[in-house]
From Swiss-Prot:
<comment type="pathway">
    <text>Amino-acid biosynthesis; L-histidine biosynthesis; L-histidine from 5-phospho-alpha-D-ribose 1-diphosphate: step 2/9.</text>
</comment>
<dbReference type="Pfam" id="PF01503">
    <property type="entry name" value="PRA-PH"/>
</dbReference>
<keyword id="KW-0963">Cytoplasm</keyword>
<comment type="similarity">
    <text>Belongs to the PRA-PH family.</text>
</comment>
<dbReference type="InterPro" id="IPR008179">
    <property type="entry name" value="HisE"/>
</dbReference>
<dbReference type="InterPro" id="IPR021130">
    <property type="entry name" value="PRib-ATP_PPHydrolase-like"/>
</dbReference>
<keyword id="KW-0067">ATP-binding</keyword>
<dbReference type="GO" id="GO:0005737">
    <property type="term" value="C:cytoplasm"/>
</dbReference>
<keyword id="KW-0378">Hydrolase</keyword>
<dbReference type="GO" id="GO:0000105">
    <property type="term" value="P:L-histidine biosynthetic process"/>
</dbReference>
<keyword id="KW-0547">Nucleotide-binding</keyword>
<dbReference type="GO" id="GO:0004636">
    <property type="term" value="F:phosphoribosyl-ATP diphosphatase activity"/>
</dbReference>
<keyword id="KW-0028">Amino-acid biosynthesis</keyword>
<keyword id="KW-0368">Histidine biosynthesis</keyword>
<protein>
    <recommendedName>
        <fullName>Phosphoribosyl-ATP pyrophosphatase</fullName>
        <ecNumber>3.6.1.31</ecNumber>
    </recommendedName>
</protein>
<dbReference type="GO" id="GO:0005524">
    <property type="term" value="F:ATP binding"/>
</dbReference>
Length: 106
């Protein structure tokens, strides 16, 4: 695997032709709620890792989060092209972050 799009395609293939006993198959078998729970857990782990010194833990946890987000996209039928198109629409645009409420408790 070389990039995120290839990983997405591999996950999509695994959903279409499950490899029994694999973690990916386990997630798809358990369904959307389990996948969402994992995305939430991994997001929290990325936040904690980012607060710690060093990059190894952050790198590891970010890889986990990206994998689980890709599983979520496949489960929901959202194509990688849809994500790329959305990112392309945003390229060069100014953010409206000032209009968003501030997060006070993190």
């Amino acid at each position: 695997m070389q990039n995120m799009e290839e990983l997405y395609e591999l996950i999509k293939q695994r959903k279409a032709t499950p490899k029994k006993g694999s973690y990916t198959d386990y997630l798809f078998t358990k369904g959307l709620d389990k996948i969402l729970k994992k995305v939430g857990e991994e997001s929290t782990e990325v936040i904690v890792a980012a607060k710690n010194p060093g990059d190894d833990e952050l790198t590891y946890e970010t890889a986990d989060l990206l994998y689980h987000v890709l599983v979520l996209l496949v489960e929901r039928g959202v194509s990688f092209d849809q994500i790329k198109q959305e990112l392309a629409k945003r390229e060069g645009k100014m953010s409206d972050y000032k209009d968003r409420p501030e997060i006070k408790n993190l």
